[in-house]
């Protein structure tokens, strides 16, 4: 008896998910495999991917265009939260997983499948993100993860697929693993597993090498409403359009590359290369606008929330009660985070050079050191006396 009768497989067209199709049927006795590819703006031609799934043995191959939802329901929330895992990674891949899990569950329920399958290995974070999200949305569905159990190396996986006529775009001599969507690219494996090895220029696609970037800076203006980016250079943009244009503008100046040693949820460290031009600049600009529009105590408290939020997303807990609670707090803080941020792009750097907002808490006649200064300097002495009182009492006590 097989492990499941009908399975919906998260499908990318890559090596692992393609090999999963014959493996599920031949090794695990699955009768029917339905593949589901999510169009997350990865730029691939999806019809060839759909055809590849059918040629690999899928009974049906589906494609879901979820780009708009990906940006509005996932990326924008992360921007409002200034979410950077370990203060560097803007979670482009991690944000896609709960959305993919959601449409997998919806498809399984529609087609009467009894299991969900994915091609994640046992060393990565994605297995956690998929499994936890699926069980949160429908705990009655089984989860099958062939790559977690089959024990094949990447080279052996490629060879297994070739036995069933599955071609691989990955060169056996340099097997980089690449994941791409609208928010960015992640590159790992191969020569990159040596943390001292400088990444070759050939791995990058969304960002130019510094030597190839323009010799003059470019200035852009990003407009926010309620913490959500809505305009670029004064022109209103649809969510997907905004991300696409920013990726092009920012990447053209070599901005958006990340090379980091990352702490994975499964307990190991991994060398990861990311390209995420739009998200990095949007978070940078959004955080700057918050400094203009939020009070000091809210700003400082929210910084701690942001770290927790990024860990929750990274660790696959998008549908957890804590995530829901943090969302409520973050949304409340964003009510007055509206305005425009001016960014200078030049030779791999993005620099905030100006910001403005109708909700600005910056008061020129209190901040100035000029003749228009309205700050009550005499009041400072009494404030300092009260502020420092606990410290003086403590000091007297330990010295007595």
From Swiss-Prot:
Location(s) in or outside the cell: Cytoplasm
EC number: 6.3.4.5
InterPro entries xrefs: Arginosuc_syn_C, Arginosuc_syn_N, Arginosuc_synth, Arginosuc_synth_CS, Arginosuc_synth_type_1_subfam, AS_cat/multimer_dom_body, Rossmann-like_a/b/a_fold
Residues involved in L-citrulline binding: 89, 125, 129, 177, 186, 262, 274
Reaction it catalyzes: L-citrulline + L-aspartate + ATP = 2-(N(omega)-L-arginino)succinate + AMP + diphosphate + H(+)
GO BP, one annotated term: urea cycle
Binding site for L-aspartate: 121, 125-126
Main location: cytoplasm
Involved pathway(s): Amino-acid biosynthesis; L-arginine biosynthesis; L-arginine from L-ornithine and carbamoyl phosphate: step 2/3
PROSITE patterns cross-referenced by the UniProt entry: ARGININOSUCCIN_SYN_1, ARGININOSUCCIN_SYN_2
GO CC term (a single one): cytoplasm
Keywords in alphabetical order: Amino-acid biosynthesis, Arginine biosynthesis, ATP-binding, Cytoplasm, Ligase, Nucleotide-binding
Record-level Gene Ontology MF annotations: argininosuccinate synthase activity; ATP binding
Pfam family, one: Arginosuc_syn_C
Residues annotated as binding ATP: 10-18, 38, 119
Self-association state and partner proteins as the record states: Homotetramer.
Family to which the UniProt record says this protein belongs: Belongs to the argininosuccinate synthase family. Type 1 subfamily.
Protein name as annotated: Argininosuccinate synthase
Lineage: Bacteria, Bacillati, Cyanobacteriota, Cyanophyceae, Nostocales
């Amino acid at each position: 008896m097989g492990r499941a009768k009908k399975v919906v497989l998260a499908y990318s067209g890559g090596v692992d998910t393609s090999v999963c199709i014959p493996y599920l049927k031949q090794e695990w006795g699955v009768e029917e495999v339905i593949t589901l590819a999510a169009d997350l703006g990865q730029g691939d031609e999806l019809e060839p991917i759909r055809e590849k799934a059918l040629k690999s043995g899928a009974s049906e191959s589906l494609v879901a265009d979820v780009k708009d939802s990906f940006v509005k329901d996932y990326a924008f929330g992360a921007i409002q939260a200034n979410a950077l895992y370990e203060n560097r990674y803007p979670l482009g891949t991690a944000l896609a997983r709960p959305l993919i899990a959601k449409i997998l569950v919806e498809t399984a329920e529609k087609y009467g499948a009894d299991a969900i399958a994915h091609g994640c290995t046992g060393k990565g974070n994605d297995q956690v993100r998929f499994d936890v999200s699926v069980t949160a949305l429908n705990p009655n569905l089984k989860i099958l993860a062939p790559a977690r159990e089959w024990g094949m190396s990447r080279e052996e996986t490629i060879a297994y697929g070739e036995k069933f006529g599955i071609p691989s775009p990955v060169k056996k001599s340099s097997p980089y693993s690449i994941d791409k969507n609208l928010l960015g690219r992640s590159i790992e494996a191969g020569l990159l597993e040596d943390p001292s090895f400088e990444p070759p220029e050939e791995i990058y696609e969304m960002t130019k090498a510094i030597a190839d970037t323009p010799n003059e800076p470019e200035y852009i203006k990003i407009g926010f409403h309620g913490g959500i980016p809505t305009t670029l250079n004064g022109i209103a943009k649809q969510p997907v359009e905004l991300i696409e244009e920013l990726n092009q503008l920012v990447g053209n100046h070599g901005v958006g590359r990340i090379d980091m040693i990352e702490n994975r949820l499964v307990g190991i460290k991994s060398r990861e290369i990311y390209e995420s031009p739009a998200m990095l600049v949007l978070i940078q600009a959004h955080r700057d606008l918050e400094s203009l529009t939020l009070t000091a105590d809210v700003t400082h408290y929210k910084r701690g929330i942001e770290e927790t939020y990024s860990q929750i997303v990274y660790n696959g807990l998008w549908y957890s009660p804590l995530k829901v609670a943090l969302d409520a707090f973050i949304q409340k803080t964003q009510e007055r985070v509206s305005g425009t941020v001016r960014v200078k792009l030049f030779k791999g750097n993005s620099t905030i050079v100006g910001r403005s907002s109708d909700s600005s808490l910056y008061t020129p006649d209190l901040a100035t050191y000029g003749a228009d200064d309205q700050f009550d300097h005499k009041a400072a002495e009494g404030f300092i006396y009260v502020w420092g009182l606990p410290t003086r009492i403590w000091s007297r006590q330990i010295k007595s």
